[in-house]
Amino acid sequence: MHTDIIIGDQFAANNNYWVMQSPELDYRHELMGRLHKIEPADVELEVLAAAAAAANNNNNTSSNNNHSSNSSSNNSNGSQTPNGNNNSSLATGGHQHHQFHHHLHHHHSHQHHHQHHHLHQHHSHSLQSGESGASEAWPHLPAPSYASDVPHAQQQQLQPAGSPNSNSNGAYGCAPLYDGAPYEVALGYGGAVVASTGGATSSDKEYLYETKNKEALYADPLDDPYQRPVLWDDITTSIQNIDPENALMLSSSGSSNNNGSSNSSSNTGESATSQLPQVKMEAIDESLLETFSTPLLSPLEIKTEKQQRQQQHQHQQQQQQQQQQQQQHQQQHQQQYQQQHYQQHYQQQHLYQHHPSLALPGLPPAVDVVELQLQQQHQQQQHLQHNNSSSSSPKLATPGDNSGNTSSYQQQYASQLVSGSGGGYLNGSSSNSYGYSWHSSQSFHTKYQIHPPSAAASATASATATPTAQLGAQQQQQQQQQQQLQQLCPPAAPSTPSTSSSSISSSSASSASRHMFVPPLTPPSSDPGSPGSSMVAAAAAAAAQRRTTPPPPYQQGHVMGLINPPPTLQLLGGAATGSNNSCTTTLTTLTPASAIQQQQQQPQQQQVPQQQPPPTPRSSGGGRRGRHSHHQPGTAAHIASLMSVRTVRYNRRNNPELEKRRIHHCDFVGCSKVYTKSSHLKAHQRIHTGEKPYTCQWPECEWRFARSDELTRHYRKHTGAKPFKCIVCERSFARSDHLALHMKRHLPKNK
């Protein structure tokens, strides 16, 4: 026994295995079956010489990869019409019931072409590469013979229900090499045994080498190495009940292909009808297709479905990306306007706090604040309504949300007027501000105290504030929080160019741009009853922190006065969007719980005010002269006041957010240091190891350091550089801690 392994277009001699491949269909699997090695003891072979009656006898067996030889199957198939199923197109026109193409080549050629033409018929037939037919050496075969001429596309769509052996484009045949007349291996379409083509009825043993391929119409998994579908008997019986026309085909295929025992008389009684086409064209209809587990699809339909799914998926992704871009654009737009308004508002606040004489001469300061804010509300509401009407994203703010922001914004200034008329506009201390009523407790604020407005002004202010102050108990709670906010950050008053000189405005503008740093207002690190001690303790750290990063270049504020969103959204350092919760979340940042949440954003928030100088027309004239105005003796008081505001924050030792991020532990025995960055841990471990990789490159200096900042500090001894300057006096220092100690001299003493 000798067979050939066919892989692609190449032959490999082997006597055990043969390989089938069908790469053109996505839902087909690569099949591999074991060919039964026929021994003389298993099957009695009767080889006849070439005779006139039996010149082309087909020897077909039903071993079927199950290691069972059917000794007497299909013995009486020759009694019917010769040339019934195999080589002649005259008996059955078109051979639509065939599936496999058996190409038996001459032993001198072994050619595998992509286009063959049948010698006896007029149909064309294409053989794809990778599916070349197996050919044996037939010394007496004059010309290649073909078992079927149906095109590939037609055969792919004509696969029947009961065919477990349908490999529509397979051109495979593994025929034994006999010394007698040539034998042709013909595989039946539905797995049925094919009658012989010889003219005489002989008792020759017929051997059928078939393959067990997974049918495309069945989605059941295979339960054994020989590719038998799960519950095959149940499926065939159910289909026989539904479609009795194909019952013959199903019974023959089930008996001769899928049963492991030897079926000696399965096809002898059906020899009269085995010549008929196994599957009729009208049998494949909708009623038959409904019984299958998977629909019958051609490869073209599968490809088009995949393309449609891919196009739909891409279209959905594009829509999602467009929506995200629109949302990001709107958020950036709102944040820009909030930052711009914050610059202008803080400048006005600083001017009005330290220079009350800059207000309008005829009106009290509180009334000016209300009128200015009403104008800003009107502009802001119009602009936000325009933005929301033009935006298509449903997640952005609506005009109703903006009206809620403006109403709470009006309540803020209404509450200021109520508290101001009661007991001093800025000097009325509140019990809810952590004990830090700075403007009433510090003695140096006497020259900047703001007197309460007159009776007429307070009446006008109360009349202005009454429509907005009657909105419910929840808004009264917001007013209390806003009062706390305004004690730490007083509102701004307008200053016009007609009433302010260039020197005063330039000095105030420069001081505002230099000292406008307002960090998130959080509970202080010391006892709430001792504001002076916490002020002194944090002044050094405040000055050092301001000096750690160089100030960025000043920005141009040409779009400053266009839109004015509420400044409360940015006063506390939160980048809020125009939603319903924007006012409530930012106005409640004075509570300890929310202050803890603000600590994670401190590094970014501390740099925001430095990038927001207030360029206005009244400060453009004397900006350069105003840089030196902080050397005046009167400005030391509001330097200390600004430092006192900056002290309300956590330090590095009691910040719970930093404790969560400290994940790098020192592994040395007895050391409990933990760091947030691995680079800090490496620098610390050099203390234990004694490593000092940073060497001073100054001539005749051999100092070495474990950290780069220590080397930088050491270089200043050689160069004499003193980059840390006092903002009050003209002294400079080479180290930031020395400047922090010096700043304590400028702080007022608490009595």
From Swiss-Prot:
Reported consequences of knocking out the gene: Severely reduced growth of microtubule-based dendritic branches and elevated levels of microtubule-severing protein spas. Gradual conversion of multipolar neurons into the bipolar or unipolar morphology.
First and last residues of each zinc finger (C2H2-type): 664-688, 694-718, 724-746
Pfam families: zf-C2H2
Reported tissue expression: Highly enriched in the peripheral nervous system but is absent from the central nervous system. Expressed in neurons with more than one dendrite including da neurons, bd neurons and the dmd1 neuron but undetectable in neurons with single dendrites such as external sensory organ neurons and chodonotal neurons.
Biological processes per GO annotation: negative regulation of microtubule depolymerization; negative regulation of transcription by RNA polymerase II; nervous system development; positive regulation of dendrite extension; positive regulation of dendrite morphogenesis; positive regulation of transcription by RNA polymerase II; regulation of transcription by RNA polymerase II
Location(s) in or outside the cell: Nucleus
Positions of region (Disordered): 57-167, 248-275, 304-351, 374-410, 458-578, 594-639
Name the record gives this protein: Dendritic arbor reduction protein 1
Protein source organism: Drosophila melanogaster
Classification of source organism: Eukaryota, Metazoa, Ecdysozoa, Arthropoda, Hexapoda
